[in-house]
């Protein structure tokens, strides 16, 4: 397990600047969303002596962040004139981890202490910034026990994976009960397999066919706790389903939950493997193909298919996110969930030496880059 954060012990450990620096946008562009981003230096309008001031430690660049810049994401922040702009603007980013560097004297600070590591309770707070300001501790969740990479990604991938496993099925951990999921190499799927294993639930993860299939499958099973990994060609093969699948699942197996983030043919194939009156949750659509399910699954097998959106779920019930983070941290501390560090490429923002132009190019690289998930880590 990676070492957790160390806490500053005095308020003199950090000097709050008069000017903040944020990556902002006023317009949207679908074809090249990097064009709408700019770096803005501004004086915060809040009274910092009466506010909770946070310095940013790291923020990931998520697909939802990019979709907001494109203007196609259903949830987006309100644009304001708070950043000394000619047009209303918003700070980009929905997720990140921060350190408390200044607290007000009143009750609004709650149980926060200088040096606490926190994440925002809700999305649309604007995380691509060197500092952020909050008015109440009730808008923040402490994550002191998590390493940097887990803390910076727990709001989206962590919550999604944990809630998909925990919030919809009343599991019998002593039974032979299964989850089937596609996109088995995704960050969310890796959380799912780890959480499920800790709860005594078995997982069948489907991944794309590839030359190094056995190598990837072994990592997913040995490192991330998947019970069994199969390929999409096996997932779509009716003979495999009839002759091989039952041997994998074992006696009295119950495939009770399907998790779909691909759509298209893959979603129908995982749905076919569910028991009667089971549930399929769709939380993504990587193939950009619609979810098409056979009529027979609904009529004769009583399939329920519904969507899951972590932003809306936690907006409607903020306590569910607080509880999820608490349970996630417990599993992390027990060693049931490992850090996603190996899956992340870090981009360094040195707050003393990185110029505005370099910062903008850094984030643009994170948006357009391929391969591993990109995370901007601030050096102070």
Swiss-Prot record:
Enzyme class per UniProt: oxidoreductase
Effect of residue 73 to N: 0.1% of catalytic activity. No specific ARS1 binding
Induction: Positively regulated by the zinc-responsive transcriptional regulator ZAP1.
Gene Ontology MF terms: DNA binding; enoyl-[acyl-carrier-protein] reductase (NADPH) activity
Entry-linked SUPFAM superfamilies: GroES-like (SSF50129), NAD(P)-binding Rossmann-fold domains (SSF51735)
Main localization category: mitochondrion
Residues annotated as transit peptide in the record: 1-9
Modified residues (Phosphoserine): 339
Xref: InterPro entries: GroES-like_sf, Mito_Enoyl-ACP_Reductase, NAD(P)-bd_dom_sf
Record's GO cellular component terms: mitochondrial matrix; mitochondrion
The UniProt record lists the keyword Mitochondrion: yes
Keywords: DNA-binding, Fatty acid biosynthesis, Fatty acid metabolism, Lipid biosynthesis, Lipid metabolism, Mitochondrion, NADP, Oxidoreductase, Phosphoprotein, Transit peptide
Active-site residues per Swiss-Prot or TrEMBL entry: 73
Catalytic activity: a 2,3-saturated acyl-[ACP] + NADP(+) = a (2E)-enoyl-[ACP] + NADPH + H(+); (2E,4E)-hexadienoyl-CoA + NADPH + H(+) = (4E)-hexenoyl-CoA + NADP(+); (2E)-hexenoyl-CoA + NADPH + H(+) = hexanoyl-CoA + NADP(+)
Keyword Transmembrane: no
Subcellular location field: Mitochondrion matrix
A Gene Ontology biological process term: fatty acid biosynthetic process
Entry EC no(s): 1.3.1.104
Record-listed NADP(+) binding positions: 157, 185-188, 208-210, 283-286, 308-310, 373
More about this protein: Present with 1560 molecules/cell in log phase SD medium.
Functional description taken from the UniProt entry: Catalyzes the NADPH-dependent reduction of trans-2-enoyl thioesters in mitochondrial fatty acid synthesis (fatty acid synthesis type II). Fatty acid chain elongation in mitochondria uses acyl carrier protein (ACP) as an acyl group carrier, but the enzyme accepts both ACP and CoA thioesters as substrates in vitro. Required for respiration and the maintenance of the mitochondrial compartment.
Quaternary state and interactors: Homodimer or in a complex with other proteins. Interacts with ARS1.
Entries under PANTHER family matching the protein: ENOYL-[ACYL-CARRIER-PROTEIN] REDUCTASE, MITOCHONDRIAL
Family: Belongs to the zinc-containing alcohol dehydrogenase family. Quinone oxidoreductase subfamily.
Protein name, UniProt field: Enoyl-[acyl-carrier-protein] reductase, mitochondrial
Provenance organism: Saccharomyces cerevisiae (strain ATCC 204508 / S288c)
Record gene name: ETR1
């Amino acid at each position: 397990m990676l070492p957790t954060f160390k806490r500053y012990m005095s308020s003199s450990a950090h000097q709050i600047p008069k000017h903040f620096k944020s990556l902002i946008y006023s317009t949207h562009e679908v074809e090249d969303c990097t064009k709408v981003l700019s770096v803005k230096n501004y004086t915060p309008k809040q009274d910092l002596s009466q506010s909770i001031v946070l310095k940013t430690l790291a923020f990931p660049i998520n697909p939802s962040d990019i979709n907001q810049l494109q203007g196609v994401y259903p949830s987006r922040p309100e644009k304001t004139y708070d950043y000394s702009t000619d047009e209303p603007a918003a700070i980009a980013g929905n997720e990140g981890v921060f350190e408390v560097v200044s607290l007000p004297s009143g009750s609004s600070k709650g149980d926060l202490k200088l040096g606490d590591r926190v994440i925002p309770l809700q999305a649309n707070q604007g995380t691509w910034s060197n500092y952020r300001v909050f008015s109440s501790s009730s808008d923040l969740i402490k994550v002191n026990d998590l390493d940097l990479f887990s803390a910076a990604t727990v709001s989206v991938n962590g919550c999604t994976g944990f809630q998909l496993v925990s919030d919809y099925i009343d599991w019998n951990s002593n039974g032979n009960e299964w989850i089937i999921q596609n996109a088995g190499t995704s960050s969310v799927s890796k959380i799912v397999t780890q959480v499920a294993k800790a709860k005594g639930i078995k997982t069948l993860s489907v991944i794309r066919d590839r030359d190094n299939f056995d190598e990837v499958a072994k990592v997913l099973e040995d490192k991330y706790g998947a019970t069994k990994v199969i390929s999409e060609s096996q997932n779509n093969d009716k003979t495999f389903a009839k002759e091989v699948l039952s041997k994998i699942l074992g006696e009295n197996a119950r495939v009770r939950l399907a998790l779909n983030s691909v759509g298209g043919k893959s979603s129908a194939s995982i749905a076919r493997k569910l028991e009667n009156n089971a549930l399929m949750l769709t939380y993504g659509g990587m193939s950009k193909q619609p979810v098409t399910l056979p009529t027979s699954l609904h009529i004769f097998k009583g399939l329920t298919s519904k969507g899951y959106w972590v932003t809306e779920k936690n907006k409607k019930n903020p306590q569910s996110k607080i509880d999820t983070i608490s349970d996630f941290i417990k599993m992390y501390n027990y060693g049931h969930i490992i850090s996603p560090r190996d899956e992340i490429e870090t981009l360094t923002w040195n707050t003393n030496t990185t110029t505005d132009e370099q910062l903008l190019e850094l984030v643009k690289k994170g948006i357009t880059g391929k391969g591993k998930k990109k995370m901007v880590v601030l050096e102070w």
